[in-house]
C-alpha cells in the first residue's frame, strides 16, 4: 500500500476533527475517529521532525555558504 502524502494526511486529519466537532457524531464513532486522528497526528508530527532535521543538516553543511551570502549583502 502506497504511503499517503503529508498534505493528504493533513486533509484527512482536518476531516476527522470536523467530524469530532459535529454534535451528531455518536460516542462510539467519536472514539474510533479520535484513535485514527491521534495516529495521523503522530505520523504528521514525526514527518515534520524528520524534515526539520534534514533542513538543519543541509544548513549546517552549507553554513559557510549562507554566512558568505549574508556577509556579502552587508557590503
Curated annotation (Swiss-Prot):
It comes from the Bacteria. One of its GO terms (biological process) is DNA catabolic process. Heterooligomer composed of large and small subunits. Belongs to the XseB family. Bidirectionally degrades single-stranded DNA into large acid-insoluble oligonucleotides, which are then degraded further into small acid-soluble oligonucleotides. Keywords: Cytoplasm, Exonuclease, Hydrolase, Nuclease. Its main location: cytoplasm. It catalyses: Exonucleolytic cleavage in either 5'- to 3'- or 3'- to 5'-direction to yield nucleoside 5'-phosphates. One of its GO terms (molecular function) is exodeoxyribonuclease VII activity. InterPro entries: Exonuc_VII_S, Exonuc_VII_ssu_sf. This is Exodeoxyribonuclease 7 small subunit. The keyword Nuclease applies. GO terms for cellular component: cytosol; exodeoxyribonuclease VII complex. It is found in: Cytoplasm.
Amino acid at each position: 500500500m502506497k504511503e499517503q502524502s503529508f498534505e493528504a494526511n493533513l486533509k484527512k486529519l482536518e476531516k476527522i476533527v470536523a467530524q469530532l466537532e459535529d454534535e451528531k457524531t455518536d460516542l462510539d464513532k467519536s472514539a474510533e475517529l479520535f484513535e485514527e486522528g491521534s495516529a495521523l497526528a503522530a505520523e504528521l508530527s514525526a514527518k515534520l521532525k524528520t524534515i526539520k532535521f534534514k533542513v538543519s543538516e543541509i544548513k549546517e553543511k552549507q553554513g559557510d555558504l549562507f554566512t558568505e551570502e549574508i556577509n556579502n549583502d552587508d557590503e
